[in-house]
């Protein structure tokens, strides 16, 4: 280490991998002025847009998607891995990396293998309740293994939460509420339901909540619904003087959305749970009904602290909204209890914690002084 710490972030592909990496990048820059930050990605991932937007350097390698079934891709996998590892080793040398922080996904696997070959220390962060293949490999030779939850299947881990952007972790919902409600056209004293299904929306959530629009309006509940840019939403004609149902394809200001809402209906991807709990927003989580069940596991900690409910996608219906969500939204005491439970399970300092660990590891490996505080 030549005085300037160089960090390689391996978290490309989906927003669930890129966003935590960018949150940690921001924390690193705040903690260690002059730190050199490089993100690793591929031309296929969201990082090609998200990383430059945040002002960080991006280096691209050959994509190594892990096939989910037998195909020609499986036969080509070893060749792709070797090529991606070779490219990553060259990048590690070029940027003089002192530490690699991996967040899982197909960019992380070659990063871990290359770092091991180049003797660059590794820090692994797992956001999901069930770890994927890349992090299972990386955890075997990482200096530190950090996780959002206690048992993601990586052996001994340090629970730190999932890094989220500072606009969320620093959000004061109560202080911003009046501005947020004015922004979306809600009354100051409205009860507001926030509905969103991630960056692409969720058709089942869209159909169910829009199908319950009349029941929600009859109960005096306003709705803020992000239905996804690729989807459409059909709503009944509003009753004169009824509460607004604000439907938009995408919410560019999630901080305002969280501040305006009293309750959310959403999926339970790792980033969604991390953000919703960080701001202390009660939620009804509807796990995506595919994969290995990790979304249900992601929601378990907040359910255990009383900050949320879980309902299966197959059980979500307009009748469920009328029978369960409406009474919940009109019960001030229960909402207050759930708000406290959501905040209890949330982690607002995860990005800073991961950044501290990475800087410590880099300095320890270089024989420098321990600690950056």
Curated annotation (Swiss-Prot):
BP-aspect Gene Ontology terms: carbohydrate metabolic process; cell division; cell wall organization; lipid glycosylation; peptidoglycan biosynthetic process; regulation of cell shape
UniProt subcellular location: Cell membrane
Enzyme Commission (EC) number: 2.4.1.227
One Gene Ontology term, aspect cellular component: plasma membrane
InterPro entries in the record: GlcNAc_MurG, Glyco_trans_28_C, GlycoTrans_28_N
Catalytic activity: di-trans,octa-cis-undecaprenyl diphospho-N-acetyl-alpha-D-muramoyl-L-alanyl-D-glutamyl-meso-2,6-diaminopimeloyl-D-alanyl-D-alanine + UDP-N-acetyl-alpha-D-glucosamine = di-trans,octa-cis-undecaprenyl diphospho-[N-acetyl-alpha-D-glucosaminyl-(1->4)]-N-acetyl-alpha-D-muramoyl-L-alanyl-D-glutamyl-meso-2,6-diaminopimeloyl-D-alanyl-D-alanine + UDP + H(+)
Coiled coil start-end: none
Keywords: Cell cycle, Cell division, Cell membrane, Cell shape, Cell wall biogenesis/degradation, Glycosyltransferase, Membrane, Peptidoglycan synthesis, Transferase
Membrane association type: Peripheral membrane protein
Annotated signal peptide: none
Any Pfam family the entry gives: Glyco_transf_28
Keyword Methyltransferase assigned: no
Pathway terms, separated by semicolons: Cell wall biogenesis; peptidoglycan biosynthesis
Keyword match Cell division: yes
Major localization listed first in the record, in broad terms: membrane
Family designation: Belongs to the glycosyltransferase 28 family. MurG subfamily.
The protein's role, per its UniProt record: Cell wall formation. Catalyzes the transfer of a GlcNAc subunit on undecaprenyl-pyrophosphoryl-MurNAc-pentapeptide (lipid intermediate I) to form undecaprenyl-pyrophosphoryl-MurNAc-(pentapeptide)GlcNAc (lipid intermediate II).
Protein name (record): UDP-N-acetylglucosamine--N-acetylmuramyl-(pentapeptide) pyrophosphoryl-undecaprenol N-acetylglucosamine transferase
Originating organism: Mycobacterium sp. (strain JLS)
Gene that produces this protein: murG
């Amino acid at each position: 280490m030549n005085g300037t710490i160089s960090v390689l972030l391996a978290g490309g592909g989906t927003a669930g991998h890129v966003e935590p990496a960018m949150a940690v990048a921001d924390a690193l820059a705040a903690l260690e002025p002059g730190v050199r930050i490089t993100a690793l990605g591929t031309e296929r991932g969201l990082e090609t847009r998200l990383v430059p937007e945040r002002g960080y350097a991006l280096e691209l390698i050959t994509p190594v998607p892990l096939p989910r079934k037998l195909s020609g891709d499986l036969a080509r996998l070893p060749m792709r891995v070797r090529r991606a590892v070779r490219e990553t080793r060259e990048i590690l040398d070029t940027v003089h990396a002192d530490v690699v922080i991996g967040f899982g996904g197909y960019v992380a696997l070659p990063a871990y293998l290359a770092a091991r070959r180049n003797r660059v220390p590794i820090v692994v962060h797992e956001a999901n309740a069930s770890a994927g293949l890349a992090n299972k490999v990386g955890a075997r030779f990482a200096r530190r293994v950090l996780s959002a939850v206690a048992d993601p299947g990586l052996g001994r881990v340090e629970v730190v939460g999932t890094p989220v952007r500072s606009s969320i972790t620093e959000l004061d919902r109560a202080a911003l509420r009046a501005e947020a409600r004015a922004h979306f056209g809600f009354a100051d004293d409205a009860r507001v339901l926030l509905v969103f299904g991630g960056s692409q929306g969720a058709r089942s959530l869209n159909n169910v909540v829009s199908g319950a629009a009349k029941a929600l309006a009859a109960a005096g509940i306003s709705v803020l619904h992000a239905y996804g840019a690729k989807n459409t939403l059909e709503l009944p004609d509003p009753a004169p003087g009824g509460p607004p149902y604000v439907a938009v394809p995408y919410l560019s200001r999630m901080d305002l959305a969280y501040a305006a809402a009293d309750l959310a209906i959403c999926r339970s991807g790792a980033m969604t749970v991390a953000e919703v709990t960080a701001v202390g927003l009660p939620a009804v989580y509807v796990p995506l009904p595919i994969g290995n069940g990790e979304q249900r596991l992601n929601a378990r900690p907040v359910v255990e602290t009383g900050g949320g409910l879980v309902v299966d996608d197959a059980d979500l219906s307009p009748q469920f909204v009328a029978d369960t969500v409406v009474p919940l939204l009109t019960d001030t005491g229960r909402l207050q209890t759930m708000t406290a439970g959501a905040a209890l399970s949330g982690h607002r300092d995860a990005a800073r914690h991961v950044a501290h660990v990475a800087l410590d590891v880099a300095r320890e490996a270089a024989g420098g002084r321990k600690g950056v505080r």
